[in-house]
From Swiss-Prot:
EC code(s) of this entry: 4.2.1.20
GO CC terms in record: cytosol
Keywords per UniProt: Amino-acid biosynthesis, Aromatic amino acid biosynthesis, Lyase, Tryptophan biosynthesis
Pathway(s) of this molecule: Amino-acid biosynthesis; L-tryptophan biosynthesis; L-tryptophan from chorismate: step 5/5
One GO BP: L-tryptophan biosynthetic process
Residues at the active site: E43, D54
Catalytic activity: (1S,2R)-1-C-(indol-3-yl)glycerol 3-phosphate + L-serine = D-glyceraldehyde 3-phosphate + L-tryptophan + H2O
Protein name in UniProt: Tryptophan synthase alpha chain
Function: The alpha subunit is responsible for the aldol cleavage of indoleglycerol phosphate to indole and glyceraldehyde 3-phosphate.
Family affiliation: Belongs to the TrpA family.
Disulfide-bonded cysteines: none
Subunit structure: Tetramer of two alpha and two beta chains.
HAMAP family reported for this sequence: Trp_synth_alpha (MF_00131)
Length: 267
């Protein structure tokens, strides 16, 4: 299990990529680039054919990964390869619940352990159904990451009291995707979550530029960035796949990712 111990001036930068997009070996290099860009932890997404929480950018990434033959087992093993190749930040497996259900639970947790996966995030599992999985995570020393969206304060308290690692605070209802602006009601909601939580609070769903990062960092402990990075991978995919242009494309990706991290001001 991991804890994110932040210094007062330090902010979380938690990027999301889809395992196997555009091809598995490039996913490893992308993870290393994100670590160099200042990532605090990495969300590694499992490609799924019916991703209810994801917008078109991540849906297309899932399709590219599925076309490569990716599945939950291969995604976990890819996380292990990342750890073997120098990624030492926590890796959080981001998966819908159905792929987990397809596996024997002991086998699933053994895979997580063997591949040094640090955390688990299941976006489509409501609070009422998550307790047994949370307990299993605890017994296997895997950090279960809780998602919170605007809801009643009593429900918020229940979710946040059980939170480990960090709280993933959903900035917008609906699917993931780049947003130019957020509803004004999101800011008091984030402040409420921050006041209730004893673990760091990271804001995700729609963070797409440096200005939004600065704004969210003022009221939370940092950001989760998914669609903006996955869209950049899509833009660079042909150059990332080609051995001749890969290094240059990886550097371009790292520079782009750094705008979301605490290293931006050091560059």
């Amino acid at each position: 299990m991991f804890k994110l111990d932040l210094q007062p001036s330090e902010k979380l930068f938690i990027p999301f990529i889809t395992a196997g997009d555009p091809v598995p070996e490039v996913s490893i290099e992308l993870a290393k680039s994100l670590q160099k860009a200042g990532a605090t932890a990495l969300e590694l997404g499992v490609a799924y054919s019916d991703p209810l929480a994801d917008g078109p950018v991540i849906q297309r990434a899932s399709k590219r990964a599925l076309d490569q033959g990716m599945n939950i087992v291969k995604a976990i093993e890819l996380g292990g390869e990342m750890k073997k190749n120098g990624v030492n930040i926590p890796i959080i497996l981001f998966t819908y619940y159905n792929p987990v259900l397809q596996l024997n639970k002991e086998y699933f947790f053994a895979l997580l352990r063997e591949n040094h996966i640090d955390g688990l995030l299941v976006p489509d599992l409501p609070l009422e159904e998550s307790n047994s999985l949370q307990e299993e995570c605890k017994s296997h020393e895997v950090t279960y990451i809780s998602l919170v969206a605007p809801t009643s304060e009593s429900r918020l308290k229940t979710i946040i009291e059980q939170a480990e690692g960090f709280v993933y605070c959903v900035s917008s209802l609906g699917v993931t995707g780049v947003r130019n602006e957020f509803n004004s009601s999101v800011y008091p909601f984030i402040r409420t979550v921050k006041n209730l939580s004893t673990v760091p609070v990271a804001v995700g769903f729609g963070i797409s530029n440096r200005e939004q990062v600065i704004k969210m960092n003022e009221i939370s402990d940092g950001v989760v960035v998914g669609s903006a990075l996955v869209r950049k991978i899509e833009e660079l995919k042909d150059r990332l796949i080609s051995a001749e242009t890969r290094n240059q494309a990886l550097q371009e990706f790292e520079d782009y990712a750094m705008a979301f991290s605490g290293l931006y001001s050091l560059k």
